[in-house]
């Protein structure tokens, strides 16, 4: 989870923003998580080409929860690369997130209620279970291919990817 970081004085009091993530660099931070390049000064590694199987956190194992228009590019990116996007809202903003859902920019919309037992909580837990099942099936499939001395077929992996 990225948001911001503060510079603290010797007494442990926050005295100045050290890092903030705004609408213009949110997608960059999603790529940083994807590639495992968390050093914000390391743009070279971030922009280097990297094979998908070397990426630390695949998009298919990401859930992006956003609450505003500044999150739409990341939500769209999540959906494009196989992750999940959830828009949360205050009741007065429901129409806007309904539009995101109807245009395929998000997978789900929920009130911004993060408490245990809410529809948002249940759905996030179900998505995580789905991700775990897909990973388990892909590992079993790859193990069986290894047992017969072969590599998985190119299309085989897609059978277990989230859509």
Positions of PLM-derived features:
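C-terminal cap/substrate-recognition subdomain and adjoining C-terminal extension
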Residues: 1-163
């Amino acid at each position: 989870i990225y948001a911001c970081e503060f510079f603290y004085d010797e007494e442990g009091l926050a005295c100045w923003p050290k890092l903030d993530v705004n609408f213009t660099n949110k997608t960059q931070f999603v790529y940083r998580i994807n590639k495992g390049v968390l050093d914000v000064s390391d743009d070279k590694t971030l922009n280097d080409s990297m094979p998908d199987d070397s990426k630390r956190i695949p998009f298919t194992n990401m859930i992006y929860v956003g609450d505003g228009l500044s999150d739409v590019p990341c939500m769209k990116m999540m959906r494009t690369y196989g992750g999940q996007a959830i828009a949360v809202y205050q009741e007065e903003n429901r129409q806007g997130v309904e539009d995101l859902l109807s245009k395929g920019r998000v997978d789900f919309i929920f009130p911004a209620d993060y408490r245990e037992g809410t529809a948002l909580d249940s759905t996030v837990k179900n998505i995580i279970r789905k991700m775990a099942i897909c990973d388990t099936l892909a590992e079993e499939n790859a193990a069986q291919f290894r047992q017969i001395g072969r590599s998985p077929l190119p299309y085989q992996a897609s059978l277990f990817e989230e859509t």
